[in-house]
Regions:
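Intrinsically disordered, glycine/charged-rich C-terminal tails and inter-domain linkers
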Residues: 2, 131-132, 136-222
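Residues immediately flanking
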Residues: 17, 102, 138
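Residues that scaffold the ATP/ADP-binding catalytic core of kinase and kinase-like folds
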Residues: 23, 108, 144
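A short glycine-enriched loop-to-beta-strand structural element that forms part of the catalytic core
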Residues: 61-62, 66, 94-108
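Short, hydrophobic/aromatic alpha-helical segments in well-folded domains
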Residues: 81-85, 101, 121
Protein backbone atom coordinates (compact mmCIF):
# COMPACT_ATOMS: atom_id res chain seq x y z
CA UNK A 1 0.00 0.00 0.00
CA UNK A 2 1.26 3.46 -0.92
CA UNK A 3 1.19 5.53 2.29
CA UNK A 4 1.76 8.78 0.41
CA UNK A 5 -0.64 11.52 1.57
CA UNK A 6 -1.99 14.45 -0.41
CA UNK A 7 -3.31 17.42 1.58
CA UNK A 8 -5.30 20.32 0.12
CA UNK A 9 -8.55 22.27 0.41
CA UNK A 10 -11.35 20.35 -1.26
CA UNK A 11 -15.07 20.25 -1.93
CA UNK A 12 -16.70 17.22 -0.29
CA UNK A 13 -20.20 15.80 -0.81
CA UNK A 14 -21.08 13.35 1.94
CA UNK A 15 -24.08 11.01 1.50
CA UNK A 16 -25.71 8.75 4.07
CA UNK A 17 -28.26 6.05 3.18
CA UNK A 18 -31.35 6.14 5.39
CA UNK A 19 -32.69 2.95 6.94
CA UNK A 20 -29.64 0.90 6.01
CA UNK A 21 -29.07 -0.40 9.54
CA UNK A 22 -32.64 -1.69 9.64
CA UNK A 23 -32.12 -3.43 6.30
CA UNK A 24 -29.00 -5.12 7.67
CA UNK A 25 -31.15 -6.67 10.38
CA UNK A 26 -34.08 -7.72 8.18
CA UNK A 27 -32.88 -8.25 4.59
CA UNK A 28 -30.77 -11.05 3.06
CA UNK A 29 -27.18 -9.99 2.46
CA UNK A 30 -27.44 -10.74 -1.27
CA UNK A 31 -30.29 -8.22 -1.54
CA UNK A 32 -28.15 -5.54 0.09
CA UNK A 33 -25.19 -6.45 -2.11
CA UNK A 34 -27.33 -5.90 -5.20
CA UNK A 35 -28.64 -2.57 -3.92
CA UNK A 36 -25.17 -1.30 -3.02
CA UNK A 37 -23.81 -2.46 -6.40
CA UNK A 38 -26.48 -0.38 -8.12
CA UNK A 39 -25.64 2.68 -6.04
CA UNK A 40 -21.92 2.30 -6.73
CA UNK A 41 -22.61 1.95 -10.46
CA UNK A 42 -24.60 5.20 -10.41
CA UNK A 43 -21.83 6.94 -8.49
CA UNK A 44 -19.17 5.74 -10.92
CA UNK A 45 -21.30 6.77 -13.90
CA UNK A 46 -21.45 10.34 -12.60
CA UNK A 47 -17.77 10.53 -11.63
CA UNK A 48 -16.50 9.23 -14.98
CA UNK A 49 -17.78 12.40 -16.68
CA UNK A 50 -15.29 14.43 -14.60
CA UNK A 51 -12.20 12.19 -14.24
CA UNK A 52 -9.82 15.09 -13.64
CA UNK A 53 -12.07 16.86 -11.14
CA UNK A 54 -13.90 14.38 -8.89
CA UNK A 55 -13.14 11.12 -7.10
CA UNK A 56 -14.98 9.07 -4.48
CA UNK A 57 -14.61 6.97 -1.34
CA UNK A 58 -17.23 4.65 0.10
CA UNK A 59 -17.78 2.50 3.16
CA UNK A 60 -20.86 0.77 4.63
CA UNK A 61 -23.83 3.14 4.08
CA UNK A 62 -21.69 6.22 3.37
CA UNK A 63 -20.71 7.56 -0.06
CA UNK A 64 -18.28 10.47 -0.40
CA UNK A 65 -17.46 12.55 -3.46
CA UNK A 66 -14.50 14.91 -3.28
CA UNK A 67 -12.72 17.30 -5.60
CA UNK A 68 -9.20 16.46 -6.74
CA UNK A 69 -7.97 19.99 -6.16
CA UNK A 70 -8.92 23.28 -4.55
CA UNK A 71 -9.41 24.97 -7.91
CA UNK A 72 -12.71 26.75 -8.51
CA UNK A 73 -13.37 24.68 -11.65
CA UNK A 74 -13.86 21.59 -9.50
CA UNK A 75 -16.94 22.99 -7.75
CA UNK A 76 -19.29 22.81 -10.79
CA UNK A 77 -18.08 19.26 -11.46
CA UNK A 78 -18.70 18.13 -7.90
CA UNK A 79 -22.07 19.90 -7.76
CA UNK A 80 -23.23 18.25 -11.00
CA UNK A 81 -22.07 14.84 -9.78
CA UNK A 82 -23.64 15.20 -6.33
CA UNK A 83 -27.05 16.46 -7.45
CA UNK A 84 -27.42 13.92 -10.25
CA UNK A 85 -26.31 11.07 -7.98
CA UNK A 86 -28.89 11.99 -5.34
CA UNK A 87 -31.69 12.28 -7.88
CA UNK A 88 -30.80 8.89 -9.40
CA UNK A 89 -30.98 7.27 -5.98
CA UNK A 90 -34.39 8.74 -5.20
CA UNK A 91 -35.74 7.67 -8.60
CA UNK A 92 -34.75 4.12 -7.62
CA UNK A 93 -36.48 4.41 -4.25
CA UNK A 94 -33.25 4.75 -2.27
CA UNK A 95 -33.52 7.22 0.61
CA UNK A 96 -30.48 9.33 1.41
CA UNK A 97 -29.36 12.71 2.68
CA UNK A 98 -26.25 14.67 1.83
CA UNK A 99 -24.17 17.75 2.52
CA UNK A 100 -21.47 19.65 0.67
CA UNK A 101 -18.58 21.20 2.58
CA UNK A 102 -15.26 22.86 1.82
CA UNK A 103 -11.95 22.74 3.65
CA UNK A 104 -8.75 20.85 4.30
CA UNK A 105 -8.57 17.12 3.71
CA UNK A 106 -5.77 14.58 3.45
CA UNK A 107 -6.10 11.51 1.23
CA UNK A 108 -3.66 8.61 1.48
CA UNK A 109 -3.09 4.85 1.44
CA UNK A 110 -3.97 4.48 -2.24
CA UNK A 111 -6.94 6.85 -1.70
CA UNK A 112 -8.47 4.46 0.83
CA UNK A 113 -8.12 6.84 3.77
CA UNK A 114 -9.50 10.35 4.21
CA UNK A 115 -9.14 12.69 7.18
CA UNK A 116 -9.59 16.41 7.69
CA UNK A 117 -11.86 19.17 8.93
CA UNK A 118 -13.90 19.25 5.72
CA UNK A 119 -14.66 15.55 6.06
CA UNK A 120 -15.83 16.04 9.66
CA UNK A 121 -17.90 19.09 8.72
CA UNK A 122 -19.65 17.30 5.87
CA UNK A 123 -20.36 14.31 8.12
CA UNK A 124 -21.89 16.41 10.89
CA UNK A 125 -24.17 18.41 8.61
CA UNK A 126 -25.21 15.32 6.66
CA UNK A 127 -26.09 13.25 9.73
CA UNK A 128 -28.05 16.04 11.42
CA UNK A 129 -30.69 16.50 8.71
CA UNK A 130 -34.18 15.12 9.35
CA UNK A 131 -35.32 14.74 5.74
CA UNK A 132 -34.04 13.65 2.31
CA UNK A 133 -32.05 16.78 1.62
CA UNK A 134 -28.79 17.99 0.09
CA UNK A 135 -27.36 21.07 1.75
CA UNK A 136 -24.42 23.44 1.53
CA UNK A 137 -22.77 23.75 4.94
CA UNK A 138 -21.40 27.13 6.10
CA UNK A 139 -17.88 26.19 4.97
CA UNK A 140 -19.17 25.61 1.44
CA UNK A 141 -21.40 28.67 1.23
CA UNK A 142 -18.62 30.79 2.71
CA UNK A 143 -16.16 29.64 0.05
CA UNK A 144 -18.74 30.31 -2.67
CA UNK A 145 -19.15 33.85 -1.32
CA UNK A 146 -15.38 34.35 -1.63
CA UNK A 147 -15.62 33.08 -5.22
CA UNK A 148 -18.54 35.48 -5.81
CA UNK A 149 -20.84 32.58 -6.69
CA UNK A 150 -24.47 32.78 -5.57
CA UNK A 151 -25.75 29.27 -4.67
CA UNK A 152 -29.30 30.38 -5.41
CA UNK A 153 -28.37 30.46 -9.10
CA UNK A 154 -27.59 26.74 -8.92
CA UNK A 155 -30.86 25.57 -7.40
CA UNK A 156 -30.15 26.16 -3.71
CA UNK A 157 -32.58 27.87 -1.34
CA UNK A 158 -31.85 29.72 1.88
CA UNK A 159 -34.50 28.32 4.21
CA UNK A 160 -34.88 26.67 7.59
CA UNK A 161 -33.52 23.11 7.58
CA UNK A 162 -35.20 20.35 9.62
CA UNK A 163 -32.44 19.31 12.01
CA UNK A 164 -32.38 16.25 14.23
CA UNK A 165 -30.37 17.84 17.05
CA UNK A 166 -29.49 21.46 16.33
CA UNK A 167 -31.76 24.00 18.01
CA UNK A 168 -31.04 26.88 15.60
CA UNK A 169 -30.67 27.22 11.86
CA UNK A 170 -27.40 28.62 10.57
CA UNK A 171 -28.10 31.46 8.19
CA UNK A 172 -25.24 30.27 5.96
CA UNK A 173 -26.84 26.87 5.23
CA UNK A 174 -28.55 26.40 1.85
CA UNK A 175 -30.76 23.49 0.72
CA UNK A 176 -30.92 22.08 -2.80
CA UNK A 177 -34.41 22.56 -4.27
CA UNK A 178 -34.10 19.85 -6.99
CA UNK A 179 -35.17 22.59 -9.41
CA UNK A 180 -32.71 23.86 -12.03
CA UNK A 181 -35.12 26.24 -13.74
CA UNK A 182 -38.72 26.72 -14.72
CA UNK A 183 -40.66 23.70 -15.96
CA UNK A 184 -44.10 23.04 -17.42
CA UNK A 185 -44.68 19.93 -15.30
CA UNK A 186 -44.43 18.98 -11.59
CA UNK A 187 -41.19 17.62 -10.19
CA UNK A 188 -40.88 13.99 -11.38
CA UNK A 189 -39.37 13.01 -8.02
CA UNK A 190 -42.61 13.69 -6.15
CA UNK A 191 -44.41 10.52 -7.20
CA UNK A 192 -41.48 8.35 -6.11
CA UNK A 193 -41.14 10.20 -2.80
CA UNK A 194 -44.85 9.68 -2.11
CA UNK A 195 -44.45 5.96 -2.83
CA UNK A 196 -41.44 5.81 -0.51
CA UNK A 197 -43.39 7.60 2.22
CA UNK A 198 -46.18 5.01 2.01
CA UNK A 199 -43.67 2.18 2.45
CA UNK A 200 -41.63 3.87 5.18
CA UNK A 201 -41.98 2.97 8.88
CA UNK A 202 -44.36 5.24 10.75
CA UNK A 203 -41.53 6.97 12.56
CA UNK A 204 -39.79 7.89 9.29
CA UNK A 205 -42.74 9.20 7.28
CA UNK A 206 -42.23 12.79 8.41
CA UNK A 207 -38.84 12.87 6.67
CA UNK A 208 -40.56 12.25 3.34
CA UNK A 209 -43.41 14.64 4.05
CA UNK A 210 -40.95 17.45 4.78
CA UNK A 211 -39.05 16.73 1.56
CA UNK A 212 -42.22 16.67 -0.54
CA UNK A 213 -43.49 19.95 0.93
CA UNK A 214 -40.12 21.62 0.33
CA UNK A 215 -39.95 20.54 -3.33
CA UNK A 216 -43.57 21.54 -3.97
CA UNK A 217 -42.92 24.97 -2.46
CA UNK A 218 -39.87 25.75 -4.58
CA UNK A 219 -40.55 23.92 -7.86
CA UNK A 220 -41.04 26.57 -10.55
CA UNK A 221 -43.83 25.80 -13.02
CA UNK A 222 -44.24 28.03 -16.05
Amino acid sequence: VDHCWQSYNAWIAHFDLLGFKSKLETSPIHFLQSEVDGIVNDLQAEVKDFPSNVDYVLYADTFILYSKSSESKDYPALLHTATHFMEKCIYKGIALRGSISYGEIAVGNDKRTMIGRAFLDSYQYCEDQDWLGLILSPTASGQLAEMQIDPIRHGFIHEEIPWRKRSITNREVFAYSFCRGRSNFPCPLLQKLEEMEQLAPEGAKLKYERTIRFIEKHWQIV
